[in-house]
């Protein structure tokens, strides 16, 4: 069980049903429940973290705002962004929250290296950065020794909604995406047109770092009501 991971591709979904489904999964899981990673693209939404301050939303306009229970401040999710929710029993894996954050950041850093993109984490602000521009946001919640929420990696999306907020609470934080970094040198091997182009690499890096060897892949199109 400690080596087994279920990876679910949920396709494109609204935020709130998936958020509620994460709660249900975490509330109902027990020691025999497999760890899971959910891959999803969200319809446009701003999500406020537990510590989210209203002043960091500058002009939401027609994009809805959802008050979430993850760590961190406000961020934006939209089509073309790879969201991975990491539902792991940390006690069973014998890792702490800080170690999990480091593993997730290194998963993204290693994934980006496949595209010859150099990136790094920052001790003062969780996430992954390319030349101090943010390419991946990170926010987690722990309940009953289990993690939920996860990462949001910008692949090929409309970045303009980030200008309506102070991303993750940082005024003037510049956001960047993978497609813009590789579009002039794209090949069949390092294509970054769609989130699905990056899914296999991300999962490979995550399962290597977190030592999963028995991986089951599922595709779901349900709306998690």
Curated annotation (Swiss-Prot):
Belongs to the LipB family. GO terms for cellular component: cytoplasm. Substrate binds at residues 70-77, 137-139, 150-152. The record marks 134 as: Lowers pKa of active site Cys. It catalyses: octanoyl-[ACP] + L-lysyl-[protein] = N(6)-octanoyl-L-lysyl-[protein] + holo-[ACP] + H(+). It is an enzyme of class 2 (transferase). Keywords: Acyltransferase, Cytoplasm, Transferase. This is Octanoyltransferase. Residues 31-214 form the BPL/LPL catalytic domain.
């Amino acid at each position: 069980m400690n080596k087994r991971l279920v990876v679910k591709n949920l396709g494109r979904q609204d935020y709130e049903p998936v958020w509620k489904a994460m709660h249900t999964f975490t509330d109902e899981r027990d020691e025999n429940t497999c760890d899971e990673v959910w891959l999803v693209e969200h319809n446009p939404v701003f999500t406020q973290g537990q510590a989210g301050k209203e002043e960091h939303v500058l002009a939401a306009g027609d994009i809805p705002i959802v008050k979430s229970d993850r760590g961190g401040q406000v961020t934006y999710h939209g089509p073309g962004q790879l969201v991975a929710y990491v539902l792991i029993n940390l006690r069973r894996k014998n890792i702490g929250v800080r170690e999990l954050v480091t593993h997730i950041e290194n998963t993204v850093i290693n994934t980006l290296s496949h595209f010859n993109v150099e990136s790094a984490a920052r001790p003062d602000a969780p996430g992954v950065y390319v030349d101090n521009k943010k390419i991946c946001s990170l926010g987690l919640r722990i309940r009953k020794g289990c993690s939920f929420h996860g990462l949001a990696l910008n692949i090929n999306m409309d970045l303009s909604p980030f200008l309506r907020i102070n991303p993750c609470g940082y005024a003037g934080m510049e956001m960047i995406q993978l497609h813009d970094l590789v579009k002039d040198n794209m090949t069949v091997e390092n294509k970054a047109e769609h989130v699905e182009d990056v899914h296999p690499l991300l999962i490979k890096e995550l399962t290597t770092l977190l030592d999963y060897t028995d991986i089951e892949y599922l595709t779901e199109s349900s709306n998690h009501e």
